[in-house]
Amino acid sequence: MFSKISSILQQAVEALAPSLPLQEDFVYHWKAITHYYIETSDDKAPVTDTNIPSHLEQMLDILVQEENERESGETGPCMEYLLHHKVLETLYTLGKADCPPGMKQQVLIFYTKLLGRIRQPLLPHINVHRPVQKLIRLCGEVLANPTENEEIQFLCIVCAKLKQDPYLVNFFLENKSKGAQSGGYIFPGGSAQHELLNDTGQPERTVGANADPGNESSSGDLKPSASSEASANHIQQDYNLVNSLLNLTKSPDGRIAVKACEGLMLLVSLPEVAAAKCLTQSTSLCQLLTDRLTSLYQALPHSIDPLDIETVEGINWGLDSYSVKEDASAFPGKRALISFLSWFDYCDQLIKEAHRIAASAMARSVRERFLVGIMEPQLLQTSEIGILTATALLHRIVRQVTSKSLLEQIVYFILGEHRDPETLRDVHKTPLRHRLIEHCNHISDEISIMTLRLFEHLLHKPNEHILYNLVLRNLEERNYTEYKPPCPEDKDIVENGQIPGAVDLEEDPIFTGMSPENTLSKEWLSASPPITPEHHRTDGKTEVHKIVNSFLCLVPDEAKSSYQVEGTGYDTYLRDAHRQFREYCAICLRWDWPGAAKAIDKCNLEAPFFEGHFLKVLFDRMGRILDQPYDVNLQVTSVLSKLSLFPHPHIHEFLLDPYVNLAPGCRSLFSVIVRVVGDLMVRIQRIPEFTPKLLLVRKRLLGLEPDGPMVDHMTLLEGVIVLEEFCKELAAIAFVKYHSSSTP
């Protein structure tokens, strides 16, 4: 009670007293603090019952006023006094002792405001960065500490200052041996009062405001980036700023944890190599990321509806305020799922912002400790429910990832790092890759669809290894083709408008009677270049109208139904194909792909051809399109159309060129569809009223007809509809790609 009255009286006296010069006023307030420790005998009274908070606030106001009255960069006498008399060192000692109780909180507030409100750079001064470093060590020591809020504010202002001047981070990398020796700055007596009694007020060695931090060899701190990078590799270092933030990420107070995560985000982005190495080699940052991912993943229910995993929203690591009571669409495990995906989002953003050295190390840690150690066994299990949930979670991760380094490690986890052509005996090299590809052909349609969607989203990611590993490495030598040297009479055939060696599909019995609605219009054909004698098949650019019409007339007329429904024509696919092709071209822009196929004379055509496990499964699935569920067919054709969009000449030739000379035993997408059509023509003859039933099913699928009695051969009819639409889509893709390549 009496201390509060004395505090009020003291403030009144200060307000009425004549103003002193700033330096005298500053020294007065500092001496008032030191005299408290000399004169008081009650060190258990809380600091809020003393004048110390008021004096500290006055000192800060004086420093700010002094800076405002001087030219930019000029150090005034009050700041000189603070630096030379080691005021911050003394305050650190008082804060560490927490004498009187609550002093640590006041010291943290003073440091935070000093660094935040003073514009001139303070951290280069030895008598600033050294006590700041010591105070950092006190932060995060105890979770749920009453000073947690002040601790995180202080740490974040230090991080912000380092973000402004990244080279300063070298002051905060301590040699472990030296850091242990330099612990506290308390005199042998051990009390805070003892240190103050030994402070004679005489200035020690002067450190100018613009002192070169690189010359402070006597401070025991690491020199700035001028120090050799090699030394950083041999000296074990402490990064206490990171360690304190890591401790505070575990705070039960969500706001504190988020602020700590923000501080780490600032630190990982610093461009200093030594800091990046220390971050990953001498701190537990990588372990924290993966351990929390693991614990959150293991907290998920064993079974979650894949649709819930796909559609859950509100995933943002900094906004985690989910309330079950307010969520009308809550499902079992939603809280745990959001927590897991939010932390993955944080890992992704952290790696995205990080220095490349730190990013690479953190991404590898996520792969080794979480993906391989935790997720892989879940993906390889035999329980269908477990496989479905694990695949859906992996699919969500693939969709969500944005950082280049983490994406690369996820790709290596799923596909492996091999780039040699595949063989049938390669299964043991990458068991997870093989198992996931097998799951595309799983007995469970749900697992097949989910795994196909995983690969579809994987193909849309900006990573060259994905497509090369799955497809391109097997097409590199073009040994799916059979080279036939042109005969002398080929020139005459070309001049007559035909292509040597090509099958004239328009004269094939399968393709006779093509209706006008299925042919390419004259406007679209106008983009095709004129046929020239130099235009051979082997250049991969067979005339676009022949290619397009080849796909459009694949399905016989009696198996077509789109022309009887408005708005389902071929032209509807052109717009989508054009948009998607531009997107894929943007993805592949930096991959340095060739503009033309590899010359036949440079290809090893004698090597045995294997299309690869991925294309094998897709082609096998495509071959069963008439006997598979509608949803499976949609997903299979979706993946194949995405593959066809890639602007690589070998992919275009293998998937979109009907006229390619296939080597014996090889198949292309077109040849697979031809076999399906042949089977379809036989089966049509056995189904009475096939065309009316087909039209009815199409209208039901489009919602133009209400559901009624079950139609016989429903799976076959739905498969025919998907087949027709897929052929139109491939025709549109072929046209768009050719038009793009022929446009100057």
Swiss-Prot record:
Residues 215-229 have a biased composition (Polar residues). It comes from the Eukaryota. Residues 197-229 are annotated as: Disordered. InterPro entries: FHIP, FHIP_C, FHIP_KELAA_motif. PANTHER family: FHF COMPLEX SUBUNIT HOOK INTERACTING PROTEIN 2A, RAI16 PROTEIN-RELATED. Belongs to the FHIP family. May be required for proper functioning of the nervous system. This is FHF complex subunit HOOK interacting protein 2A. It comes from Xenopus laevis (African clawed frog). The lineage of its organism: Eukaryota, Metazoa, Chordata, Craniata, Vertebrata. The gene is fhip2a.
